[in-house]
Amino acid sequence: MRFNVIVQSAADFQTWVVDQQQPAPAPQTDLEKAGAQIVTQGICSACHTVDGTAAQGKIGPNLTHLYSRSIFAGGIAPLTDANLQAWVMDSAAMKPGSLMASVHVSQQDIDKIMAYLKTLK
């Protein structure tokens, strides 16, 4: 697994710690709300946690502040909308041996999931 080290002042680090302890923001748009339902009450919640929601899985990464990160997938990919969508659609294609289950969802549901995930900052 790769790691990136970010050097911050003590004050900036403390601000980051406080921010990371906050629950996920509430989705605002209908698309975000539909995505939240899929992520927090659907198959994603079996493995992933989103603090402040019903999603309390322990196997996969905590998604609460996903978009506060610059990389994901165990450090192999920059966190961009395109990379995350590709990961959600087929993680094994990006990272062979990925433990994320391959799920088949419609493009419409992918759009909903992505809209919600992008709110998790």
Placement of each model-derived feature along the sequence:
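Solvent-exposed, acidic/flexible segments
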Residues: 28, 32, 56, 77, ...
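Electrostatic cytochrome c docking/interface patches
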Residues: 11-40
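Extracytoplasmic/secreted envelope proteins and their assembly/folding machinery
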Residues: 2, 60-63, 81-88, 110, ...
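Extracellular/periplasmic metallocenter environments
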Residues: 1-15, 45-46, 51
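C-terminal capping alpha-helices of c-type cytochrome domains
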Residues: 9-20, 87, 91-121
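Short microdomains enriched in Cys/His and/or Lys/Arg
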Residues: 11-18, 66-76
